[in-house]
Amino acid sequence: MPIKIPDNLPAAKTLNEENIFFMDEDRAYHQDIRPLNIVIVNLMPTKIVTETQILRLIGNSPLQVNPTFIHTQTHKSQNTSKEHLIKFYETFEEIKNNKFDGMIVTGAPVETLSFENVDYWEELCRIFDWSVTNVTSTIHICWGAQAGLYHHYGIPKYELHEKLFGVFKHNLTERNIKLTRGFDDEFYAPHSRHTYVKREDIKKNPSLKILAESDEAGAYIVASENGKNIFVMGHAEYDGDTLNLEYIRDKNQGMNIKIPKNYFKDNDPEKGPMVTWRGHANLLFSNWLNYYVYQETPFEL
C-alpha cells in the first residue's frame, strides 16, 4: 500500500532504502484514490524509530494510506525534539472532530506503573472513548494492548517475575478468522515486557477471543467479536536489531538482563540476530488493513 507521508519525514530515507513504496504529498494529491486515513498514537520515546517501523508495515498494498501521527499533550517528550513534533505530529485536540478508517496505538515503556499513574492516562482514555464512534478498527500494541483491554473491558495486567524478552513461538487458537488468514500453524513474534494479561481474564469476557497464543509468552492476539478492537501483546513491528539494542542498553546500564531468547544465532550475541517474524508481521498488518479497515469502513467519512 503506497503510504502518503510528509515531505522530509526522517522515515522516508529508510523506507526508500528498503524499497518500501511511498509517495510524497504532491503525487498522492494527483491520484484519484480515496486514501485510508489511519491515525497513529505514538507513545514510544523513540518516536522516529517507531514511525519507520509502523509505516513499513502499512506500506505494502495497492491502496493508498494517509497516516496521521499524534502525540500526547500531557506528556513532555524527552527523546524527540519539539521541532519534530510540531512539524510531523498533531494532538488529540486537533484531530478529535475527524473520523478515521483505522487507528494504531503503540506500546510504551511505562508498564511497571499502574495505568492511573501514567501521566497521560486520562488523555489516552479520552482517545479510547473517542475511537468507539470515530474509528472503524483499532490495533493496539504491547502496553497499548494492555491499556486498551483495561480501559474497554476492565482486564488488569500483572507483573512478571522477570522480563519476558526474546522471540517466541505462537500457535493459532482460532482458524476461521480473517485476521489470521495465511498464518503458518506456528509463527514467531518478539516480546519485550515486564507485565502480562491472564488468559483466564480474557476468556471470561464473551466479547473477546484469543486468536493466537504462546506457551511461553501467553496470549498474543486478542480481538473483540466485531473486530473493532485488536490487541497484540508483542512487538511484530520491531526491526531486526531492536531487541539487540535493548539488550545492549540494559547491559550498559548495569541491569541484570539475560540475552533475548531464540533471537541470536546459536544464542550467541556475537553472531547477531536472526529475524524470524518479518513475514508474520506483514501479514498481520495487511490482513488488518484489508479485512478490518478497508472492507468495513464507510467510503465517506
Swiss-Prot record:
Keywords: Acyltransferase, Amino-acid biosynthesis, Cytoplasm, Methionine biosynthesis, Transferase. Pathway: Amino-acid biosynthesis; L-methionine biosynthesis via de novo pathway; O-acetyl-L-homoserine from L-homoserine: step 1/1. It is found in: Cytoplasm. Its main location: cytoplasm. Its EC number is 2.3.1.31. The keyword Transferase applies. This is Homoserine O-acetyltransferase. The record marks 192 as: Important for substrate specificity. The record marks 111 as: Important for acyl-CoA specificity. Transfers an acetyl group from acetyl-CoA to L-homoserine, forming acetyl-L-homoserine. It comes from the Bacteria. It comes from Clostridium acetobutylicum (strain ATCC 824 / DSM 792 / JCM 1419 / IAM 19013 / LMG 5710 / NBRC 13948 / NRRL B-527 / VKM B-1787 / 2291 / W). Gene3D superfamilies: 3.40.50.880.
